[in-house]
């Protein structure tokens, strides 16, 4: 773990229940939008699962996103108002798929109130304590299908 690239990211990330691996994300790219005047209309986090990695062992049926602020971890605000997504959708023999999250409120809050230290999030299996399900994810440095934060935004007059 000491050899992980915390600046450029990794090509592969892992998630596993029963006290196993979690994935930490930093949304440092959002810093460029601070004080820009842009308004985020919709934000979606897409986390692709490496094709074929969940044939032998099932992937978690859904993931949760926690905001990390020092040693405190809390569910992001989007979970308090309806379904933010995070369910695994797959197709084909090799179970190619992705987790998709609606994170609009969280991104808006970060841009409005957050300091840059709060741009850190953690992906965890929804039933972390009771399920051994695991997944191999495409990391942010994956050349073919990286994790992505898709933003739809406008600049008011």
Annotate each PLM feature.
Residues 1-157:
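Secreted, disulfide-rich extracellular signaling modules
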